[in-house]
């Protein structure tokens, strides 16, 4: 009997999902992206070679795996071609192993232009988007004016639809945002030049997945961003534009929710966040700077520095609740080496003085919230690259066990370095 496992970020993204997906991929036949776009960078280091994937599932580096892009993903044709080119230049046959839903909305140049114009207009109050047109593309999907992959099958109708939607965008860009318009002919020519390549990879993703499940094949769903950035359940409005939670698998890949066997939540041993928004445990002192330096906390796609703080069990409880997380994979454990003490946030102190163990839903309700910490002894030993749990310091064991206790979720996998071999699998998600 095959297993279907969801791998998703349980914090604010950048938890190390790419490595873990790559690690587990040798157990599966299919790896599926179901939400987001090319705004998420999944960094893989294999035999010392670094690969950053933004759109194509991380399983593409395994020859026996078929990669699927579900309807919940917003697809940038130019980003797809660039990523395919980079992989094919290294001898990886992408076109025979990548299948794309025809229902994927297309990210077009006017989406990117609108993204930049809006962020510029917001000034200091900007959301902190990656500027890749993700949000505007999802807006078009909901407004039912968006272009989809399926529209490329009829090039004349595509050209007419493009003209209408581009007129709509250019009016806003020029009249309201005082920005430059997007050129129609160049936009059309650019997408038509690569349309047939994309259409050659179109498939019915939902049916493929249903057939795979019935055939007993293992399937891995690769989430992007993190649960606390979910458009509905994250720290709104400082969120992404898609459903980053496990429910996104059903809506974004056409896979029945009862068929999900295991949800693996990826967590760092501490917390990070990119861009604006609430971050209760954020550190503004030398400790925060040291975590950022040791963890090399800069965005894989944007290069932006990440905000760093102690592990937040309160925020994680919300992620557990919304995603039915079965087990954790804790990454970057080695970054905490050398600290005299480590802390876990176990409660939030509200402005009223009340201490609660749950996270607010909207950003405004986080205002004035203070962390309530438990302090634990740190460890001086070097844990980088350790692959035997019994060889970890006792203080590490205590830290991991305490996180399991305060969250109620077991740590199934521990990561002590960026390479796939620098990992301890304590519970295999595909054998549970």
UniProtKB/Swiss-Prot annotation:
Residue numbers binding substrate: 300-306
Active site positions: 14 (proton acceptor), 42 (proton donor)
Keyword Signal tagged: no
Example GO molecular function: magnesium ion binding
GO biological process, one term: IMP metabolic process
Binding site for GTP: 13-19, 41-43, 306, 332-334, 415-417
Binding site for Mg(2+): 14, 41
Co-factor remark: Binds 1 Mg(2+) ion per subunit.
Binding locations of IMP: 14-17, 39-42, 130, 144, 225, 240, 304
SMART domains for this protein: Adenylsucc_synt
Alphabetical list of Pfam families matching this protein: Adenylsucc_synt
Cofactor(s) the protein needs: Mg(2+)
HAMAP family, sorted: Adenylosucc_synth
UniProt subunit comment: Homodimer.
Function comment: Plays an important role in the de novo pathway of purine nucleotide biosynthesis. Catalyzes the first committed step in the biosynthesis of AMP from IMP.
Protein's UniProt name: Adenylosuccinate synthetase
Provenance organism: Actinobacillus succinogenes (strain ATCC 55618 / DSM 22257 / CCUG 43843 / 130Z)
Upper lineage: Bacteria, Pseudomonadati, Pseudomonadota, Gammaproteobacteria, Pasteurellales
This protein's encoding gene: purA
